[in-house]
């Protein structure tokens, strides 16, 4: 069991836009913390957010070469209220998030592809590492008529508070 919420919208640093309002991403998570939503306590809560986090561009660089803690077990235990969250943003704070007008956002394309082909023994953080690799290496903006927007790059930003492996 897990909760998965995907938000595909416009945004800027610390703000997401809806049709009739704007809100902070934290407002999405707030209602699902263990103290506010006990039925989801101990269950993974995944948020995939496809939105700009600013207007900075990443021109990338060219490289010449590519190159669990032990604890006492107990019948009952306490967890932090923000445990078991994972938030995957399509880009790093302050930066533009790219999309193809025909195929959609780079992040969602890569996420869907990696989830579709993921082995059942691959945990979500491994899957998201491959998503980040795919977005970073396989995509580049192609707008030769707009030189400042041409050949730009992107990399997702993954924030994990998961306290166990999650495999689909």
What are these regions (language model features)?
Residues 1-168:
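Cysteine endopeptidase catalytic domains of the caspase/legumain-like
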